[in-house]
Structures are given as C-alpha cells and as structure tokens.
Amino acid sequence: GFKKGKVFLFQVRPVVLKKNYSTYKKEDFITALNKLKNKIIKLKKKNHNLIGKTTYFGVMPDWNPAEIIGIKPKALAISLYQELITDFIWAKNRESYGFNDMTSNHLMSIFLGTPFIDVRVDFNSWLPKNLNQSTKEKLINYYLNIFKNNNDYHDKIEFKILFTSFNAETNDRLKQINNNLISLNEKKKISKELKEITLN
C-alpha cells in the first residue's frame, strides 16, 4: 500500500521456483512407481466394506476432481477437497437420501499427485439401502462391467451407467438389462426404491 508517498509491504513471499526434476535419480522414479503399483493392487482387492470384486479409477467420475481442482492440484487444494467433500461429506449426503451408508470410505485416492475417484466406492454409494444384498451385488457387477467396457462413460456415469433417481427412462433402462443378470422382481424392487428416494 501507499501512504504519503511511502510504500508499505504487508507480506513478503519467497519467489517460487519450478521443481527441478533433473535432480531426481532414475531409482527415485522406479521406487515411486513401485509404491503406486502396490497401492493400486491393494485398493483393487476385494474389500469387506464394499460390494464388488475389484475397482477402477477415473479423474472424471462423480465429483470430477479433474475439472474442479485439476489433474495436478497443489497439496492445499487436495487437502481442502478431501476435507470438504471426498472424505466424508459426500457419503453423508447420499446416505441421508436413502442410499448405502458409505461414510467409512473415502471417495478419492491420490496417485503421484493426481486425484482419482474410486469407482467401486462411488457405485456402492448409489445403491438404495433397502435393496437386499444379492440385488446390490448384481447391480454393482453390472455397473463395473459397463464402466470397464466403455471408456467414454467416465464423465457420464450418472446418466449412462448408474440408477441414481427415478425418472421417465428408469423402467426402460431396467428392461434393457438381461433378466439372467437381474430378475424382473429385482428390477421392480429397484424401481420402487428409486421412486421412494426421488419422491422424498
């Protein structure tokens, strides 16, 4: 600021320089990649808290960190995003509407500085809580299979894969699922539960 011709500095910060990656050794990169591989292998394993035999990851599903905080966000942005949304709040909100309680699961994982959404966690969070376990398992396997085979759906999962509410297309979409995967009675129950959630 200026006052009577004098300059007053309110805050002084050091100049931020870009990281010099040439100081890293090849072994550092190999170690980092091996740690990442082990982390992903662990996350993809069957989890007693989650329905689904494995998982996949994406930067655009659900809360879409790629658009909201970027592909390589600063540590502060990641921390705030986790605290305000992806650690707990996201799941509490869905649970309050009548979906599965996923409050013990984090939605987002960080891989070498890039935020990824855990798709299995996301899909579990959209299961109506009053569906029986068998129907939930069938739905999750159906969702995961579609996601795996359609790379262009990563930013469209709420419209192309999941049943997140009841609308004019819900019953038609359910009819398109093979009855050997999900029975007619199960489809009726899914439709009923989605309708109750949507009307509440």
Where are these regions (language model features)?
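Conserved divalent-metal-coordinating catalytic cores
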Residues: G1-N200
